Amino acid sequence: KADCADIVKFGLTQAGGMTAASRMIASAEAANVKVVIGHGFGLNLSTMAEIMIGATSNNVLPGLECVGPLKVTDTVTNEQIDISSGEMTLTEKIGVGMTLDESKLSKYALKTL
């Protein structure tokens, strides 16, 4: 109502997950405010979740701020994300289309002191 923003940017983690992000996108759309989704740095799973949620709304501007998959040398998912061309084809698999690599989860788990 106050016309205090033309565009809103947030990441799924900041929003509180996919359901909360969907609600925020709907609220922004109702206020005629465009949305940019991105996290600056994240791994494959969070990046794919943001890509998938961004693809569900015409109110989300094209392009995500997601450089994590371009900069990491390893990931905890079995699938890789190639966004080096600036675009990708959405998966037809269930959920976000990724599975976790249990051995990588063990390898990178924070060890208790």
Language-model regions: role of each:
Residues K1-E87:
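Shared catalytic-loop signature of beta/alpha-barrel
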